[in-house]
Amino acid sequence: MCERGFARRREEVTGLNRITEKGLKDICKRDKLYQTPRLNDVLYLHFQGYQCIENLDEYTELKSLWLESNAISEIQNLTKLTKLKCLYLQNNLITKMENLEFNRELDTLNLSQNHIRKIENIGTDILPVLNTLNITSNYLTDSASLAALVECKTLSVLDLSNNRIDDILIVKIFEQMPSLKVLVLQGNPVVSRLPQYRKTLILACKELTYLDSRPVFPRDRACAEAWKREGYEGERKEVQRWNRAERRKTRESVNSTIRMRNRHLKPEDQVPLLTSSDSEEEQKGISSAEKAQKRAEMEYGSVDTMWDEVSGESQASEHSTTSSTSAEDNESAGSQADHIAERISNRRVKPLEGRPKVLYDEAASGDEKAVTTTDSKKDSNAEDLPELKDITEALLQSDTASKPPLQPTLLQSDSGSEMDNTADLEQTCQTLLQVAQGNDDGDPTPKQIKSQMIDEMYESFGSDLFEEHPLPIDQLLNESTKKYQLEAKVCCEEETTKTPRDLYKEFIEEVTWRPKSKEQLEREQECVDASEKCAHDLAEMGSHLEEDLQELRDFTENLSSDVQEQAKDPSESDEEPTEEEMEVKSQLLKEQFQDRKKRLKEAIEERKTMQKNLEARKEDLNKSYNLFAKIMDDATDNVPKRVFGAGCDVPSKDWDKEECMQQLPLTSMEDSINGRPSSNDEDILTRPLTELTSAEAAEEICSQLDRKLAGEEEALRQLLCDLENENEILYSIETQIKYAESISVEDSQSQMVCASLLNDLISDVIYKDITEMGPNSYPLGPIESDEEYTYSEEPKLEKMVPPHLENPAGGKSLRECVDTFKEFFASKGNDKPRQESHTHLEKIRAAKALLKSKSLAEFSKDTPESLDAQLAKDEDRRKRHVAASAGRCFAKREKYDDTLEVVDNRLMVVKKDTGELEELPPPPELISDSESEKEVEEDDDAYDTAEETLQEYPRVPWTTPYKPKPRKAAEHLVNEAMQRVLAEQFSELPDDTKENEPQEDEFFSLEAKETFGNLDSEFFQKLDLDKVTTANNAEAATECMRSYNELKACMKSGSTELQLTSEENEMLQEMLSSNEDLEAKHKSNDDPLVERDNELLNKMMQRMKEHEERARELQEQLEKEKEEENSGPIKLSMGEGSMLYQRWSPLSLTEIIDPQAEEGGRQAEEGGAQQEEGGAQSEEGDDQAGVPQAEEGVTQGEESVLQEEETHAENGVAQAEGRVLQSPVIYPIIGYEDIDDDDAASDFTTDYSSDDEVAVVVPPKISPAMLKAYYYDGFEEDMRMVRENEARTRRGLRAIMQKEKQMWKDNEEEMAADMAPSASPKEEHIPEVKSETETAKPTVETAKDKWAKIASRLNEFLDPEAMEQLESHEFGESDGEDDVDLTGLQNYDEESETECESALKETTEIGDSEKQENKTQDETLDPKDTEAITDEWSPYQTSFEENRTAFCDRHNKLTMITEQTSDVGDPETETTKLICQWEKIIPEDSKIGDGPTEKFLDQKAQDNTENTDERPENPKNFITLDYFVDTEPSESLEDTEATETPEVSTEQTLKTEQMEFNLDVLNDDGDVVIKEVTVEAQVTYQ
């Protein structure tokens, strides 16, 4: 490994690089390789300046790795590259070959130009398939540095060039490389030092095909081998032979062509064939070759030509080269001469003097065998006989010419020699001729004789081989005969190194059928004599074979030195038939055999005596060995080495031979077999004292214990087996029973709970759509408590919910459980979250219906450029307005009482006066998102993309029907009250409060933007022109809600009493003391705002006292009630005092209340908040009777205030603007509820409107004890207060209606000057408690009725451009800006003004139609709907029924008043219509013709960039658009068409045109995507 310090120094000095994972991926990317390391099989890391190999473990599939031209000094970190085949490491700094053990598939290794001094670690055991090694330009010097190449058995390509090798011994290393084919040694000193460098290496490397820069051809190898055999002369001959062969090949090719031509020519015209150009040289070469052949044959005993002479075929010499007369004969003669030269050159010759014999012995013997085999094969072929005769003739003629004195000697017969026996010679010649001619019927051939002799030898002594042996045949074969085959061969070969049999074999194998010369015949005679002697010796040896065999059996172990010689014995014994045969032929051989037999006998006698001596010595050794064994036995207490057999446990000295054989090794066993048993063993070895040895006793004890333990173990195993079987049976039964029980119990419980939950939830969702509740507001029925039915045990059902919703109630509060179930049902939907498909469908249908118009042609006049310019202008104006609003809000941030700080990664509320920390209202999941949005919105540039982080919960517009201002509201109300009581102390606060309004918009609108925004709400607000000018009417409810939040903020968690500061307590006492004075003053004052503030203040004071008393009384009962709550089932409903904050549209209340009731509007805010304990029928009362149905938790005073508030809201919401600054100090009241503007139940899972797009009031943080007190104990008292409020409300209705007329006039004057874009549809949020069961009741009107009214009224007030702008925003999507919903209302051109003027003329007719709609609305809410209360409220059903009558009476009165005012045509008429209907409320003013609408629209467009919180007075004309939820698609369209038919037929005409809309859609990344949608819709125009 690279040392870090060394690597760091090197990097500092030379700037070397390291192999990093990122760098490797970059290189792969550059070379277009895979980014996944294991997918690459090649990697190029050359020329990178790397200093070590590292970080390659992930490249496990590499087959080729290039690391050349780096600075690598060590081969390392290649253990994971097990499939590497090629490794290139040239041009590096490597000094040692190592660490390649794991690369066993390496085939090519290049280490050239490194610093290696020794080849190592590349043997076949390490790199078994290494084929190529390039190690040029290193520091290799001698054979020691190359010694490891001997181990490379598979290396075939070796490049050692340009090293420093100078040792000629490397040739021996190359000889031991069997696969070496390519060798490069150039550039080394050894090339010049090695004599005959190229020939030597070619001879040393048998498989070499390429040396240095040239190939090794077969001719080169043949010349080198000739040079090795015969020196330079042999090499010259070999070269000539190759040249002749090449010339002959060419000549034969030409002659064959000539012959083909001569076939078609006449004899005189034939072309002569080509003759050999070197025939004379060939003749000389033939003569010299003959002489060399004679010398060689005479020296090595070859008698081929002698036999030819003896056969008398010398007359065949007539055929010679000179006798051929034609060119063809000459050519054939030349060819024969070539063949003769080739054969002569291949025959064995005597090595030349001066050459080392060691290098050539092996090659010469090999050549000899090859030549002999070739000659024998040729001689055995009868077809070659004439040619051989010609050759022999030539040889004999040359021989007789050169040596004439020897010729007569060949025919002389020596009387004392074998030559006198002419009959024998004739018989021999006849036999040889028959064999040569292929006659197999004659005498047997030498091979047949040989096989016959071998068979007879085995027959002669095989039967008597084991006669006298005392041992059994099996034992003898297994033990002694093993070595007998190798050792039992006795002969006297010591005297002669070459036996006669060997000579005879040579004679048989080398015999040829050529005529023999005299020298050959003489040599043959000598061989025959030797053969006779050998046969005689063999016969004599066979007679003593039995004795020799007996000696071998006795002394087998002593014959190891003679084993190899004895192996020749069977082949010698087969000479017996030959002996007899030879005796018949030659008397001389018989005499020689007799002499030889005598000598053999003498030798055998000597061997016997020697054997006896050896036997005697062996007996002495045996005795000493036995004595030593006894001593060892005594020393070891006679414990045997091994116990074996039955009854053989005796001391080792008493073991019998069989046991000894099994105990001893093979040699000792043979000694025991061959040894003579001593008769006095017992005398030599004294027996032990006792027969029972310690080993025997120990063995007996051990055997007994073993048997006993074996029995016990067997019994125990059986017992355990039985127990296991029984346990398995019991376990299987028990498992089945438990499994069945668990399945049944779990299924029964889980299925029951899930079925009930799902049924309730699904029924509520379906009922919600019918009753026009907001989408995503899922009221839940009664749900069993977590204690009774826990969700920890997973039901055996198919999982229908996401993993994070599988345990909805585990460790969660009631609110979190509700949130979880709501997410569950949202996830069950097939469409996007927070949206319902049927709502989309109905909106599209309604849009098509209401956009059917004849004036669509006007839209086609607009070009894309003009529309784009207009849109850009609107967007720029909106951005400027938003930036200004944000800047003002940020500038006033220091004037708040409370601030927000991040504490422990959470956003906390810091009280300015006390410094206490409060958590933001739950749920925590949404708070963090809200605060993050708040930080984003503080940046001016963030307004365009504010909706990007709100993909799950769409943002709602800033300009919304209601903007709660909790912090500023509390401050404002307190300051107003203190101003009236102590004017000199609080005179400067109203201005500040007004300046701070925008900041509070931003502060408290964020949470609402986290709610589940509804598509319809934004759509309605875009169409609601009434809300543009009447937004300030909601100020009364807003102010009261702020005070309510301020009051709740004072109640810290865990306290049962109000925690007020001293200043607040003093202020409260002053308010209480001056309560009656203020009330009288306000009664005398004609200003409705002052009177309303006073009433609200009185209600707040009264409510404060009631809360304090209730808290003290119920403090003792908190623990008991807590236990009851825990033991009872958890009700996921809103009935028992759960505080949900829902916004109600102020106009939805004013439609059915007399205008005089406004004075009680502010009081209704504080009173409505007390309805949290009950409220099951509050919404029903609101829809049917004009005021919320009283609940047991609401006092009568609150009810009266609520009614007055509704009546006041009916007469004009905008009149609240002028009175906001004079509101008295009103403290928050616990139990307030934020009311939805769509008359639907709020989303109880989030504490803010489920579908409205404005920020909700922050819910109070009240201690659980205080909540329990409100839940359980304020019910009866609240019921009494409800009845009192009802009475007071009736008395105050008349006065309020009278005051409303005056207020309308006042607001009318302020409207023109104060119209602002911020006065977009705003809704007064009257707090009222709504239970869960209440949310499921029918609301004011179904969705189909709303859509019908929309279709019939919308086109009367909007010109086509305004309608297009209206549709340019996607439903329910908002970018979170103040005036985003007014983009369609801010830019009116002349056409829009004309349309509005024409629309104003239809006021009277519309008023009549609205009267009819009011009647229809009242009919839609039948008293029967009140029966839809869930079982949760059954205990209070009676009290509710009692209150219902009173409310219905009041509702009837209010309805009568409304109808009267509508008939008269007063300006208040238009504000009495239900907000759920699409209405046009236009007072019958004489100034309409003068263009008040144009002024109003111009003023609104100018104020678009100003503060959105400037509230204009009551407008003269406005269109009210309220939120609704459509019903099922099957109902909606039909009802819509049915509803709009009568109105359209009397007032409008329909025209179908095509309109394009730009919809702002949030994609998955949170970015705003503008989609252009074309819709064909039916728009109604005047």
Swiss-Prot record:
Residues 313-327, 1166-1178 have a biased composition (Low complexity). It comes from Drosophila pseudoobscura pseudoobscura. Residues 245-420, 560-587, 859-878, 913-942, 1073-1092, 1101-1137, 1150-1218, 1305-1345, 1358-1438, 1484-1517, 1529-1548 are annotated as: Disordered. Coiled coil: none annotated. This is Dynein axonemal assembly factor 1 homolog. Residues 572-582, 928-942, 1529-1540 have a biased composition (Acidic residues). It holds the Pfam family LRR_4. Cilium-specific protein required for cilia structures. Residues 189-227 form the LRRCT domain. Belongs to the DNAAF1 family. One of its GO terms (biological process) is cilium assembly. PROSITE patterns: LRR. Residues 409-420 have a biased composition (Polar residues).
